[in-house]
Amino acid sequence: MDTALIKDFFDCCREAKKILELLPPLPQGLTPRHIQIIDTISQLEEKNGLVKISDISTALHVTRPSITRLVSELAAAGYAQKAGSATDGRVTYVALTNKGKSCCDFYVKRYHNWVSSQLTGIKPDDLICAAATIRSFYAALKNSEPPKL
């Protein structure tokens, strides 16, 4: 493959990262990663009812310790609540508080609706293709060893 295309793709990835930086200002102490966790909890609650730390970990392909830390931060800030399973001490359930649901409504649902209204010139198939390309590119490289100096 032409290395100029690879360079252009990397440049576009850097621009794509800037898109995430266009989020409205987040409440103090929250990061875009926290918003992603809140969104995932919301989706899993709608789909399954009860949400476990392991469910979030599986959905996001992130280690359980990382999710546990992020959920603990959300709980400490009042966006989520944690509860241990009555039958299995290894299981922790997570639910959004009203504060977490409001955060999800604004930073995910309302913001995504606003973004959608701004993209009138972009076809859905173009977004599908862009997302598929990024996922394929990542999958091709994630387990490869880059060259060493």
Where are these regions (language model features)?
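Pre-recognition alpha-helix immediately N-terminal to the DNA-recognition helix
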Residues: 36-42, 102
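Key DNA-contact positions within bacterial/archaeal DNA-binding proteins
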Residues: 65
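Charged, amphipathic alpha-helical coiled-coil/dimerization segments
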Residues: 72-129
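N-terminal leader segment of winged-helix/HTH proteins
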Residues: 1-32, 39
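Terminal interaction helix/tail motif
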Residues: 7, 12, 109-149
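The alpha-helix within a helix-turn-helix
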Residues: 57
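Helix-turn-helix DNA-binding elements, focusing on the entry/boundary residues of the two helices
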Residues: 53
